[in-house]
Amino acid sequence: MIYIHKKIKNPIKDGIEIGEEIKRNVGRASLIIFITSILERDKLKQVFDGMKQHIPLDNLIGCSTGGTFSGKDYIKEDGVLILAFDEYYKSAISCEKVDREAEYVGKKIADKIKTCIRDKYPKLDIDDNFLGFVFFDWNVDSEQEILDVLGRELTIPIIGGTAADDGSFDKFFQIYKGEVVKDCCVFGVVGGKLKFDLIYGHGYEPTDIYARVTKAEGKVVYELDGKPAYQRYLEMLSEYTKLPMDIIKKYFYRDLRRLDFYLVHPLGFMDINGNYITAFLERVEENTLVFRRDILEGSFLVLMKTDIEKQVKSIVDELKKAEDFENPLIFINECYGREVLKNSMFREFEEDILKYFLNFYKAGKKVEEYVIEDNCIGWLSYGETIAKDLIRFHNNLSFTGVIFELSQSSNINWREELKNFNFEDDEIEVIVNLINKQLTAKELLQLTNLSQTKLYHILNKLEKEGIIKSVSGKPKLYYIDNIKEILQKTHEKIEHENMVKKIKRKKLLRLL
């Protein structure tokens, strides 16, 4: 598994380089997650055209984003974040237009995934772990409902989010097999001997100000405490901040480009586990509040609070789970709104900022002391998704993610280590290029400095000795079935040969 985080300057050239890097490091990737802040379709197509010169895109899924990051390195525009899984993993992908009820769409996706896995891999290992990646469209507005179906039907952990753009909410899209799609649910799974753990957080805490939902239907709340919902929300903000209503109204919501009361003090509720979570407000219609999730009549909504330290600390605390991994890689889906709060790159400059908002940045501990390592990569979304065990949750103003254990074999210097198994240099060159890959003779010629005659001689020799195997076809594919098992047999063969030589040496010495 590898990741690529890159600013695209020359689409065709950069696409070719990306394709080369994926092919060189993982071969025919079983699954490619492709997240991009390239919002111009023609430019993105050129990147894909470049990649296709070296790799197929039939297992590539993803979406647009408002920005990507690797550690503290952010790319806001024309960037790509790619996660490519080695070809020995099992995978399947699906894409469905969300033009019918969520139950139908979710079940159709799940059925396609199950059928594909069953047909491609008739025999699954008992220790195979599967992980799902899902990418939604903001305009569809049925993320939670579809996630519930996917989680129920597939019973695997799922991570992902809603496609985003530059804050304009009119340029986002999804990606399926290297093609731009809209109004869909794009889904993929990857599995095998894959160690991972999921993370989630939001960085908000409840205040002691709350209101009862006295009239609601689905995602629309009409009344709080018997008053028009929007009016009561403004009152709650005024009560907590001690600011007059005209100031609250002026700075209530400002198009996801500047700090406002909605981002600092969203409404929230208590989940079934007793944890407080945010309830994302999509819009205000007259005096009603329209949320991105169903709000139950009779429940309570609480005013939430946060500051810069809580926002940063929330993600750092979750990343402590990576301490249980020897060589972790963390992939994060983070709400665009969180970056507006904590990253000036995503905010418009204000000369005269409201004094109350300055308190947001007065952290008790320097934010710089919370270190985000370079092995933490991610993208900015308009909604964050997680399904783990019985928890199936799509939210906003939050983050979800997955911690992977990277294979320790990626740190092995194969060219040096294989010399200890009595392989010749030219044989080592072929073996190194076939580890975790399936390649044709033509591809091996491009990757090695061997002549065609020499290469075919080595391929025949290694195949005869059982070091490599091949799949008949046009062209023929060469691969290594199990590198550990092969090296173990080679080691035992060397030990046996050494023992025979040792016995013969002793026999000769006795005769002298």
UniProtKB/Swiss-Prot annotation:
Q: Which domain of life is it from?
A: Archaea
The portions of this protein that span the membrane are: none
Q: Which CDD domains match?
A: HTH_ARSR
Stored Pfam families: FIST (PF08495), FIST_C (PF10442), TrmB (PF01978)
- Which chain positions lie within coiled-coil regions? none
> PANTHER family annotated for this entry?
BLR0328 PROTEIN
List the protein's name.
Uncharacterized protein MJ1623
**Which taxonomic lineage does the organism of this UniProt entry have?**
Archaea, Methanobacteriati, Methanobacteriota, Methanomada group, Methanococci
